[in-house]
């Protein structure tokens, strides 16, 4: 495996591990998700250019658009939760309450 793709795979794995370990705060979970999406974007763009699959050249851009939408919704949710509850602890949230 190429060293760049190996380091991107390691970045994705570390972001995934960070999501699983630091899931007590919503902000740290969102940051780890953004790291995962960024490493997927770069890895997808590199693989498409390496294998000359130019018909799939819009796929990284679509992934980046979905990542931006996810970040916007996540930050809006973070602001709303911190305004209502005063903190961003995930374990204090009961999503079954109205």
From Swiss-Prot:
It catalyses: a ubiquinone + NADH + 5 H(+)(in) = a ubiquinol + NAD(+) + 4 H(+)(out). InterPro entries: NADH_UbQ_OxRdtase_chain4L/K, NUOK/Mnh_C1-like. Its EC number is 7.1.1.2. One of its GO terms (cellular component) is mitochondrial inner membrane. It is an enzyme of class 7 (translocase). It is found in: Mitochondrion inner membrane. The keyword S-adenosyl-L-methionine does not apply. It comes from the Eukaryota. Keywords: Electron transport, Membrane, Mitochondrion, Mitochondrion inner membrane, NAD, Respiratory chain, Translocase, Transmembrane, Transmembrane helix, Transport, Ubiquinone. GO terms for biological process: ATP synthesis coupled electron transport. It is a multi-pass membrane protein. The chain crosses the membrane at residues 1-21, 28-48, 59-79. One of its GO terms (molecular function) is NADH dehydrogenase (ubiquinone) activity. Core subunit of respiratory chain NADH dehydrogenase (Complex I) which is composed of 45 different subunits. PANTHER family: NADH-UBIQUINONE OXIDOREDUCTASE CHAIN 4L, NADH-UBIQUINONE OXIDOREDUCTASE SUBUNIT ND4L. Belongs to the complex I subunit 4L family. Core subunit of the mitochondrial membrane respiratory chain NADH dehydrogenase (Complex I) which catalyzes electron transfer from NADH through the respiratory chain, using ubiquinone as an electron acceptor. Part of the enzyme membrane arm which is embedded in the lipid bilayer and involved in proton translocation. This is NADH-ubiquinone oxidoreductase chain 4L. It comes from Petaurus breviceps. The gene is MT-ND4L.
């Amino acid at each position: 495996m190429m060293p760049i793709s190996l380091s991107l795979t390691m970045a994705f794995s570390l972001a995934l591990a960070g999501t699983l370990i630091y899931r007590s705060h919503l902000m740290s979970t969102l940051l780890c998700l953004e790291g995962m999406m960024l490493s997927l974007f770069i890895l997808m763009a590199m693989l498409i250019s390496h294998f000359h699959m130019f018909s799939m050249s819009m796929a990284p851009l679509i992934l980046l658009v979905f990542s931006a939408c996810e970040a916007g919704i996540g930050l809006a949710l973070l602001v709303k939760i911190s305004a209502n509850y005063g903190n961003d602890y995930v374990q204090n949230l009961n999503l079954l309450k109205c």
